[in-house]
Amino acid sequence: MAVNLYDYANQLEQALRDSDEYKAIKDAFSKVKDNEESKKLFDEFRETQLSFQQKQMQGEEIPEEDLAKAQEQAQAIEKDENISELMQAEQKMSQVFQEINQIIVKPLDEIYAD
């Protein structure tokens, strides 16, 4: 019987949706969206991050004033309880993804280990 990896991937997706880590992100993001100030800070910071990523991908340097603005945004975000909660939840989920990735690549690691 052939193994359908996509079936397992879909099961993993559902398990992630059912996980406490996913629910924590969902709840934390709802708090950010429901608070006007938190949402504004979050959106501005995401815009800045995306802009930086685009510039880096295009090989452009990021101007000092943009870096200073990003620093100010980061400091404001650290003080926002809702965003801090979201970031902590994201870190926990990131750890889960790293651990799952290690499990997924284990068969390949074993092949190349010899």
UniProtKB/Swiss-Prot annotation:
| Listed InterPro entries | Com_YlbF (IPR010368), YheA/YmcA-like_dom_sf (IPR023378)
What are the transmembrane regions? none
Species of origin:
Staphylococcus haemolyticus (strain JCSC1435)
Q: Which family does it belong to?
A: Belongs to the UPF0342 family.
Organism lineage reads as: Bacteria, Bacillati, Bacillota, Bacilli, Bacillales
A Pfam family that the UniProt record links to this protein:
Com_YlbF
Q: Show the HAMAP family listed in the entry.
A: UPF0342
Superkingdom per UniProt: Bacteria
**Would you tell me the protein name for this molecule?**
UPF0342 protein SH1117
